[in-house]
């Protein structure tokens, strides 16, 4: 027998090798008449499920009738009580010693059975208490583990919420800078259009004024500057769009993780507060064998940590892109305004040069007109002088012609004749000289007229240039967008 207080693995809980029957062995038919009890065949199975196993296990170890059976075999026939068929010898089967011995054996077996039962009850009670305390401790440990799990989930949930708030703020800020970039890109279309229209209008200059001057060079530089600025803005806009997509992807992962954390927190918190008396507690057979887990604590924490780190990385890249975009807008606005001012200065200088040239042309034209007038007056004077000299020539020639009609010897080559001849030559030479001067004056007048026409054409060209540069180009450039509009604030 095991000592008192042993566990359920004590020997009384396990059958020991014994006889397959709880009754004494039955001998032959002749010897059976000397036994205490008559022979009877068993009419029931010894292995039926309704019999108490503890009793029969004990009976296997301590058969109550075995001593009597063995004793009855040793009793001599002279001491045995005969049956009715042998009444002539004795009327009893056993002696008082057998009776006392049998009673003592019964008492001993009763004491042993009670002792075993008492020990079983004590061990069972202690087992119940031990298992109860063990189960309570296990449940408390599970509750504590659930509490720690709830704390872990709550911690990561707070981290996700904090990072999600930061990411939402960064996404909104990047969206704002993207909108500013789009507005700034739209605002650059007007300066580009103005510069191109200025170049187009300046193609309508005439003559020598169709020159590749400083204003045109600055206009071409302005077009290149605006196009370069637009290209940089488009590249940053594409980067902002891609970064926004990355931010929203990271934000979506955080929101999904947060939703999972909230559901897990709700479930684990409910499990933490479940008690034996709680509503909804029931049996779920085999649930402990179902392993639907997809992560371990390390991979679980790493998953959320990776999401947070990814969000932080995307947020840092977004902040860097915002800073670069902000600086780009300021640089672009300054570059465009600097080039705008250079173009305006070039236009101002060119307009001043044109105005000065126009004024000088006016002066030359005035002088030319004055000279034309004086030349015309001189021509009139020459013509009048020629006309006057023609009268002298006619008188002298008439005199000579009349003197040719003198008779005979009167045709004398006298002083008067010689003087008249000289007078004719002198007056004719004078007329020829005056006619030459008249021709020269007329040629000069033609030259002056050509100069006048040239000056008038140049004056018209300069007036057209001034109209294009001053009235058209500079008037369009008065509507250049402000710096605030170029950086996208308006």
UniProtKB/Swiss-Prot annotation:
InterPro entries the record matches: Tektin-like (IPR048256), Tektins (IPR000435)
GO cellular component term, pick one: acrosomal vesicle
Lineage: superkingdom: Eukaryota
GO annotation terms (biological process): cilium assembly; cilium movement involved in cell motility; flagellated sperm motility; regulation of brood size
Residues forming coiled coils: 419-456
Post-translational modification: N- and O-glycosylated. May be proteolytically processed during the epididymal transit of spermatozoa.
Record note on quaternary structure: Microtubule inner protein component of sperm flagellar doublet microtubules. Interacts with TEKT1, TEKT2, TEKT4 and TEKT5. Interacts with CCDC38.
Organs and tissues of expression: Expressed in epididymal sperm (at protein level).
Protein name: Tektin-3
Gene giving rise to this polypeptide: Tekt3
Major subcellular location class: cytoplasm
């Amino acid at each position: 027998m095991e000592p008192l207080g042993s566990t359920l693995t004590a020997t009384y809980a396990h059958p020991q090798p014994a006889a397959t029957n709880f009754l004494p062995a039955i001998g032959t038919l002749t010897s059976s008449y000397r036994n205490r009890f008559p022979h009877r065949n068993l009419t029931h199975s010894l292995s039926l499920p309704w019999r108490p196993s503890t009793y029969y296990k004990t009976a296997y170890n301590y058969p109550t009738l075995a001593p009597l059976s063995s004793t009855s075999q040793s009793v001599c026939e002279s001491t045995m009580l005969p049956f009715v068929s042998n009444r002539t010898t004795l009327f009893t089967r056993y002696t008082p010693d057998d009776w006392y011995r049998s009673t003592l054996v019964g008492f001993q077996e009763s004491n042993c059975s009670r002792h075993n039962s008492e020990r079983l009850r004590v061990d069972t009670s202690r087992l119940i208490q031990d298992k109860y305390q063990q189960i309570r401790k296990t449940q408390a440990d599970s509750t504590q583990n659930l509490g720690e799990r709830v704390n872990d989930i709550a911690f990561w949930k707070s981290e996700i919420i904090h990072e999600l708030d930061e990411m939402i703020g960064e996404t909104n800020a990047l969206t704002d800078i993207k909108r500013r970039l789009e507005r700034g890109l739209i605002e650059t279309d007007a300066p580009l259009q103005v510069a191109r229209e200025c170049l187009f209008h300046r193609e309508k200059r005439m003559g020598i004024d169709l020159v590749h001057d400083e204003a045109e060079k600055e206009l071409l530089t302005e077009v290149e500057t605006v196009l370069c600025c637009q290209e940089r803005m488009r590249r940053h806009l594409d980067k902002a769009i891609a970064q926004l997509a990355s931010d929203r992807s990271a934000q979506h992962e955080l929101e999904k993780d947060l939703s999972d954390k909230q559901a897990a927190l709700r479930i684990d918190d409910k499990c933490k507060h479940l008690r034996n008396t709680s509503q909804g507690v029931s049996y779920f057979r085999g649930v402990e064998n179902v392993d639907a887990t997809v992560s371990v604590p390390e991979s679980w924490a790493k998953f959320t940590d990776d999401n947070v780190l990814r969000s932080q990385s995307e947020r840092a890249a977004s902040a860097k892109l915002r800073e670069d975009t902000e600086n780009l807008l300021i640089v672009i606005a300054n570059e465009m305004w600097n080039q705008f001012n250079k173009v305006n200065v070039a236009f101002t200088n060119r307009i001043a040069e044109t105005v000065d040239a126009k004024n000088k042309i006016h002066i030359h034209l005035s002088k030319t007109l004055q000279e034309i007038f004086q030349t015309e007056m001189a021509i009139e004077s020459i013509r009048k002088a020629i006309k006057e000299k023609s009268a002298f020539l006619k008188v002298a020639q008439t005199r000579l012609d009349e003197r040719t009609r003198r008779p005979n010897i009167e045709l004398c080559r006298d002083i008067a004749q010689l003087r008249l001849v000289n007078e004719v030559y002198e007056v004719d030479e004078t007329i020829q000289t005056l006619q030459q001067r008249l021709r020269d004056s007329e040629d000069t007048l033609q030259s002056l007229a050509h100069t006048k026409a040239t000056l008038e054409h140049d004056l018209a060209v300069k007036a057209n240039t001034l109209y294009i540069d001053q009235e058209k180009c500079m008037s369009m450039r008065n509507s250049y967008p402000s710096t605030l509009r170029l950086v996208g604030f308006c």
